[in-house]
């Protein structure tokens, strides 16, 4: 704890509010809320914590706080601050967690479409469905049963679906709006689970077609009835009152939380959402934060009712979720919350079981690798790779694996400073010398094994730097790829030789992951540098365009091509004067003309 934090801790008020932890760069890494700011913030810097909280605390070099009038106000502010700053230690809902809905548009002649986003007053929504496949299957079934409008063509224009007998827009609907309204009502009833009348109508049509000897048409009606029956069986009835509701349950253990949400529509469980994440606050408070983010996400439909567990404050939930909040006390409804909670416990236990299994496998892999190479167990492995194109923008990267897992906070990037042209050996020599001379000088933690991406030449260069230039005794190995650019051989020893490594062994998979990761990290860094260099060279020597404005353009547009495609107004919106914008556009045009000239 530094002196600044010590001083600020003495000044904390006994009030509700939000606190924002910052790292050495001034970046907000965690946002929390508290009923009592003094007690909560001080708790981070006193006593012992679990590993993940210690990691958070180790990065805190400053904090701010905002006092609020109430705990409810603090909760709302916390949710907004998290969404604005996206701190790395806060709960993050998965980006791909939006579920598909079926939507009846509110056009004059409505259509049935699939969407993942809900817009207020933009139509009727049904769902969510577990995935796109299920939503499409339901829509295809509806398209065959109901001949409503399916395209955006003008109402008086014949479309493809009309010829298939799946659209009546050109005929009946064009003249009879009431018929159209009845058709949409039938679709609503179907999607709300009231499909008995529809099945009865289809069965009557099937029998009539059979009597007319129109067996193909009868078979189509039979298949439609079968499709509806199949869809029914995939939905478990959870409630007899046919109400739309979301049911929340959560479970905490070993510093982790699992939240389960059951989506119940028309009394049927149609999908569940599962999210697991580490929590640093009080469990109930982190659950409230999760709920706030869940519904503010705009991807989740807010039902008529939301069920919550007994331990959660109803008033706080009601402040962030605009619907009826129920804390069931007895009977079937309480059992539903208990079921969601039980599923959360099972999911969390499964995660721990998988983690334990993974730890055992990984621990075995690094132990076996050490035995194979006849070295101490390589708990810490540092791997290196170079990246350049014909010697331009040369860079290198280092990744670190601790206990067989990536330690991304220890990753390092290197711009090659002393090498001219495409010389991988010289580049590797420079990078290894820079890295391990610093390790030696500053007493940093040394790895148990160094891995270089390459063959005999790369390994010999690495050994020369480590052993002869720096006088260190760190084992060095090389990973060679085959013609398909896949991990193939492990080189080690004195003299170097190929180490026999079973292709299906855990240690081979570990080395394969390490090689892929260092290659990915190096190539990504090289692309960033190359793009920035290209960007800078094009925009050099433009009056009024200094480093800060160039950086602003790079962050916003990413590439010169994107700037060339942008309008003057879009560039000026970044705060760049019109005269400078005109100079930028002229420079890009001149460069393009120079390249196209013979």
UniProtKB/Swiss-Prot annotation:
| Family designation | Belongs to the UvrC family.
Q: Which gene encodes it?
A: uvrC
A UniProt-annotated Pfam family:
UVR
Give the function comment from the record: The UvrABC repair system catalyzes the recognition and processing of DNA lesions. UvrC both incises the 5' and 3' sides of the lesion. The N-terminal half is responsible for the 3' incision and the C-terminal half is responsible for the 5' incision.
Molecular function (GO) terms for this protein are:
DNA binding; excinuclease ABC activity
GO BP term, example: nucleotide-excision repair
The UVR domain extends over 196-231
Q: Name one GO cellular component term.
A: excinuclease repair complex
Localization per record: Cytoplasm
The record's CDD domains line, in alphabetical order, gives: GIY-YIG_UvrC_Cho
Q: What is this protein called?
A: UvrABC system protein C
- Cross-referenced SUPFAM superfamilies: C-terminal UvrC-binding domain of UvrB (SSF46600), GIY-YIG endonuclease (SSF82771), RuvA domain 2-like (SSF47781)
Residue span, GIY-YIG domain: 14-91
Q: Which UniProt keywords apply?
A: Cytoplasm, DNA damage, DNA excision, DNA repair, Excision nuclease, SOS response
On assembly, the entry states: Interacts with UvrB in an incision complex.
The family database entries (InterPro entries) matched by this protein are listed as: GIY-YIG_endonuc (IPR000305), GIY-YIG_endonuc_sf (IPR035901), GIY-YIG_UvrC_Cho (IPR047296), RuvA_2-like (IPR010994), UVR_dom (IPR001943), UVR_dom_sf (IPR036876), UvrABC_protein_C (IPR050066), UvrC (IPR004791)
């Amino acid at each position: 704890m530094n002196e600044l934090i010590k001083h600020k801790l003495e000044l904390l008020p006994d009030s509700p509010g939000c606190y924002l932890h910052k790292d050495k760069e001034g970046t907000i890494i965690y946002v929390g809320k508290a009923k009592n700011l003094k007690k909560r913030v001080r708790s981070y810097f006193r006593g012992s914590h679990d590993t993940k909280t210690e990691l958070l605390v180790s990065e805190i070099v400053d904090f701010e706080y905002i006092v609020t009038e109430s705990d409810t106000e603090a909760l709302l502010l916390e949710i907004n601050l998290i969404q604005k700053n996206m701190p790395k230690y806060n709960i993050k809902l998965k980006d791909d967690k939006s579920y598909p809905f079926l939507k009846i548009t509110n056009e004059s002649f409505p259509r049935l479409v699939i969407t993942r986003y809900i817009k207020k007053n933009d139509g009727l929504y049904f769902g969510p469905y577990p995935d796109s496949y299920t939503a499409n299957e339901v829509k295809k079934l509806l398209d065959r049963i109901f001949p409503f409008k399916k395209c955006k063509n003008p109402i008086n224009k014949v479309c493809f679906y009309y010829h298939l007998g799946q659209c009546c827009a050109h005929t009946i609907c064009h003249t009879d709006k009431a018929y159209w309204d009845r058709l949409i009502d039938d679709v609503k009833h179907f999607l709300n689970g009231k499909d008995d009348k529809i099945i009865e109508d289809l069965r009557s049509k099937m029998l009539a077609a059979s009597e007319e000897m129109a067996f193909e048409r009868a078979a189509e009606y039979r298949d439609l009835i079968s499709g509806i029956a199949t869809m029914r069986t995939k939905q478990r009835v959870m409630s007899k009152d046919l109400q739309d509701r979301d049911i929340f349950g959560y479970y905490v253990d070993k510093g982790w939380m699992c939240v389960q949400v059951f989506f119940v529509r028309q009394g049927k469980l149609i999908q569940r959402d599962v999210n697991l994440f580490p929590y640093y606050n009080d469990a109930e408070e982190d659950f409230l934060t999760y709920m706030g983010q869940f519904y503010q996400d705009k991807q989740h439909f807010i039902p008529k009712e939301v069920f919550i567990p007994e331990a959660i404050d109803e008033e706080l939930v009601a402040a962030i979720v605009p619907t009826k909040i129920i804390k069931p006390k007895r009977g079937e409804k309480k059992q539903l919350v208990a079921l969601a909670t039980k599923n959360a416990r099972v999911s969390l236990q499964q995660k721990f079981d998988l983690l334990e299994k993974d730890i055992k496998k990984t621990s075995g892999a690094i132990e076996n690798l050490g035995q194979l190479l006849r070295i101490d167990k390589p708990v810490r492995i540092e791997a290196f790779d170079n990246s350049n194109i014909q010697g331009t923008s040369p860079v290198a990267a280092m990744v670190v694996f601790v206990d067989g897992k990536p330690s991304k906070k220890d990753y390092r990037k290197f711009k090659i400073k002393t090498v001219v042209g495409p010389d991988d050996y010289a580049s590797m020599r420079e990078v290894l010398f820079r890295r391990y001379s610093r390790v030696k000088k500053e007493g940093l933690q040394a790895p148990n094994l160094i891995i270089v991406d390459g063959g005999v030449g790369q390994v010999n260069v690495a050994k020369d730097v480590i052993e002869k230039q720096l006088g260190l005794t760190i084992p060095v190995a090389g990973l060679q790829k085959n013609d398909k650019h896949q991990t193939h051989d492990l080189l080690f020893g004195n003299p170097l030789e190929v180490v026999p490594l079973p292709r299906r062994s855990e240690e081979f998979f570990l080395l394969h992951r390490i090689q892929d990761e260092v290659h990915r990290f190096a190539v990504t860094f090289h692309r960033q540098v190359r793009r920035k260099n290209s960007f800078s060279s094009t925009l050099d020597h433009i009056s009024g365009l200094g480093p800060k404005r160039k950086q602003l353009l790079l962050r916003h547009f990413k590439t010169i091509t994107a700037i060339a495609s942008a309008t003057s107004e879009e560039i000026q919106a970044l705060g760049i004067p019109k005269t400078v914008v005109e100079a930028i556009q002229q420079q890009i045009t001149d460069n393009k003309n120079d390249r196209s000239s013979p």
